[in-house]
Swiss-Prot record:
The modification Phosphothreonine is found at residue 235. CDD domains: homeodomain (cd00086). Residues 41-50 have a biased composition (Gly residues). Transcription factor that binds to the octamer motif (5'-ATTTGCAT-3'). Forms a trimeric complex with SOX2 or SOX15 on DNA and controls the expression of a number of genes involved in embryonic development such as YES1, FGF4, UTF1 and ZFP206. Critical for early embryogenesis and for embryonic stem cell pluripotency. Sumoylation enhances the protein stability, DNA binding and transactivation activity. Sumoylation is required for enhanced YES1 expression. Belongs to the POU transcription factor family. Class-5 subfamily. Residues 302-313 have a biased composition (Low complexity). This is POU domain, class 5, transcription factor 1.
Length: 360
C-alpha cells in the first residue's frame, strides 16, 4: 500500500501497532485527523482510551467542515485528507484501506476542478458584454440624423445672415436660455457629446422654424445684442482722475449726494461711477487700517510665550531615547498661558523601563 501513497503523505501506524520488522516501518508524515481516528490493530494497544478517540479526547477543537472555509459554498480545489476522515466528525474510525484510497485519489488529481458560477450571474455578465443590436441601430440612426441637421442649420444660418452668437442670443429670447457662440459652433462641428447634442437639437429645430416664419427675428436679435452689451461695461479711470479722487477722499471720505454730483461734473464722470469709487475706497481704508492696528498690537505685546520653554515629563512607557541613559524622558512644550516666575511643576517620578528582551 505504501507504493500507492503520495510523497506528501506516507501512512505510519501509531505506536503499538504491528509491523513487518521489530521496529516497524519508517515513520513518515501522517495526517493528524487520521492519527486521531486510528483505533489500532485488533489486540494491540490504541492511542487513547476507548474505541477510536476523537479530537475531544486530546483537547483539540473539532475540525470544521470544508465548506465552512468558503462561506457556505463547497470548495472545489483538492483538500488534504478529505477522504481520510468522514465529514460528520472525527470520532468514527476508518479502515486503513479506505484511508489509503482516499489519499491516493486526492494525490493523483493535481489540477483543481473549476468552480461552477451561478447561472444568474453568468446570464447578467453575458447581457452586459453583448450589446443589444436594436439599441446600437437606433443610436447610429440618431447620429446620422444629427449630422444632417447640423449641416442644415449651418446652411440656414449663413443664408439668413445670422452669426453663431446671434443664434445663441435668439435662443435666449425665445426660450429664456442664452447659449454661447462656442456651443453653437461645437454643435455645427459635431464636437459636443451625444447627450448634449440630443438636448440641443429640439431648441435649434424651433429656431430654424422661427427663422423661416418670423421676419422680425433678426431685429429682436439685434436688440438683445445691445441689451447684453449694456449689462456689463467695465469702468476704467485715468491716473490723473484717480489722483484727483484720492485727494478729494482725504478731504471728505463720505461725500453727500450734492458733493458727488459736483465731483462728477468737475471730473467728467457719471454719478454712479463716483459714488461706487468712494464706497470701494472706504472699504479699502477699513481693511488697511484694521491690518495696521493688528500688526501694532502684535508688536507691542511681544512674544506670546514669556518665560522660555517649559519641559513636561512624558507619560510612562517605552520611549526612544539615547541608549545608555536610564533617566526619565522629557519633551519641550510651549504653553499659551504665561507662568509666573518661581512656580514649578511638582516633581513626577518616572521609572525607567528596561529592555523588553531582558525584563524579568
Amino acid at each position: 500500500m505504501a507504493g500507492h501513497l503520495a510523497s506528501d503523505f506516507a501512512f505510519s501506524p501509531p505506536p503499538g501497532g504491528g509491523g513487518d520488522g521489530p521496529g516497524g516501518p519508517e515513520p513518515g508524515w501522517v495526517d493528524p485527523r487520521t492519527w486521531l481516528s486510528f483505533q489500532g490493530p485488533p489486540g494491540g494497544s490504541g492511542i487513547g482510551p476507548g474505541v477510536g478517540p476523537g479530537a475531544e479526547v486530546w483537547g483539540l477543537p473539532a475540525c470544521p467542515p470544508p465548506y465552512d472555509f468558503c462561506g457556505g459554498m463547497a470548495y472545489c480545489a483538492p483538500q488534504v485528507g478529505v477522504g481520510l476522515v468522514p465529514q460528520g466528525g472525527l470520532e468514527t474510525p476508518q479502515p486503513e484501506g479506505e484511508a489509503g484510497a482516499g489519499v491516493e485519489s486526492n494525490s493523483e488529481g493535481a489540477s483543481p476542478e473549476p468552480c461552477a458560477a451561478p447561472a444568474g450571474a453568468a446570464k447578467l455578465d453575458k447581457e452586459k458584454l453583448e450589446p443589444n443590436p436594436e439599441e446600437s441601430q437606433d443610436i447610429k440612426a440618431l447620429q446620422k440624423d444629427l449630422e444632417q441637421f447640423a449641416k442644415l442649420l449651418k446652411q440656414k444660418r449663413i443664408t439668413l445672415g445670422y452669426t453663431q452668437a446671434d443664434v445663441g442670443l435668439t435662443l435666449g429670447v425665445l426660450f429664456g436660455k442664452v447659449f454661447s457662440q462656442t456651443t453653437i459652433c461645437r454643435f455645427e462641428a459635431l464636437q459636443l457629446s451625444f447627450k448634449n447634442m440630443c438636448k440641443l437639437r429640439p431648441l435649434l429645430q424651433k429656431w430654424v422654424e422661427e427663422a423661416d416664419n418670423n421676419e422680425n427675428l433678426q431685429e429682436i436679435c439685434k436688440a438683445e445684442t445691445l441689451v447684453q452689451a449694456r449689462k456689463r461695461k467695465r469702468t476704467s479711470i485715468e491716473n490723473r482722475v484717480r489722483g484727483n479722487l484720492e485727494s478729494m477722499f482725504l478731504q471728505c471720505p463720505k461725500p453727500t449726494l450734492q458733493q458727488i454730483s459736483h465731483i462728477a461734473q468737475q471730473l467728467g464722470l457719471e454719478k454712479d461711477v463716483v459714488r461706487v469709487w468712494f464706497c470701494n475706497r472706504r472699504q479699502k481704508g477699513k481693511r488697511s487700517s484694521s491690518d495696521y492696528s493688528q500688526r501694532e498690537d502684535f508688536e507691542a505685546a511681544g512674544s506670546p510665550f514669556p518665560g522660555g520653554p517649559v519641559s513636561f515629563p512624558l507619560a510612562p512607557g517605552p520611549h526612544f531615547g539615547t541608549p545608555g541613559y536610564g533617566g526619565p524622558h522629557f519633551t519641550t512644550l510651549y504653553s499659551s498661558v504665561p507662568f509666573p516666575e518661581g512656580e514649578a511643576f511638582p516633581s513626577v517620578s518616572v521609572t525607567p523601563l528596561g529592555s523588553p528582551m531582558h525584563s524579568n
